[in-house]
Amino acid sequence: MKEFSKPIARARQVTTFIYRHGRLLDAMREKTGGRDLVRPGVTRFATAFLTLRSLHTHKDALKFLFVSDDWTRSKLARTEAGKKVHDTILSTKFWNSVEDCLRASQPLIVLLRIVDGDERPAMPEVQFCMEYAKKKIKENFPTRGKADLLKRILAIIDKRWEDQMDQPLYGAALYLNPNKYFDLKTDDVMAGKLRSAFTEVLSKMVPDQDLQNKIDDQALEYEDLRGSFSNKIAINNIKTKSPSKLFTDCTI
């Protein structure tokens, strides 16, 4: 998207310029309390937006740097590259674009951290976190003036999700994750999609028809919290026990 690619490119010009000139880099670090602007992430997407967030965090420090007497008297201030960086840092339009980028990217950065993390299995969380990320992005663009931008952001996310991640296995994993599934079950469309994903995976992984029927019956009990899933202990454990432990306890 032009609205994001342009500020990202300008931010890259700023950081490249600063990091290529030792004295300017030292002055920048003095203004930012020793903190760097470039923030590495797990992907190029994450790196770009983490760097934008760092620039935004140090916006005032950067403005002070590029209006200081030291900068004004420097040879760099008279170069074409220096003038461009100076204009970028003092541009209200640039900082507004950065804020839009951050509103769109922050929920996705959280999702990337979950997917890339070691502390919990990614698959049962991925689809729930994607839906939550989209919800947060919508909340980050509440004004009508940003409605078109929001629509295009969500369209890109949905297209990427469909191309790369919208696999029945992810939906089945979320369906079988009770501490997420029952929060989503109130949405009839989402509940139907997850049930369909589970059924598709079941038909592929369990060829025996009798066993399929038995598992499907247990799935219905799980959905409706009937049978062994209806006892108080099982219901209380929905939010605390791991999905595998809960199903082991309820289907023995």
What are these regions (language model features)?
Residues M1-I252:
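Short alpha-helical patches at protein termini and domain edges
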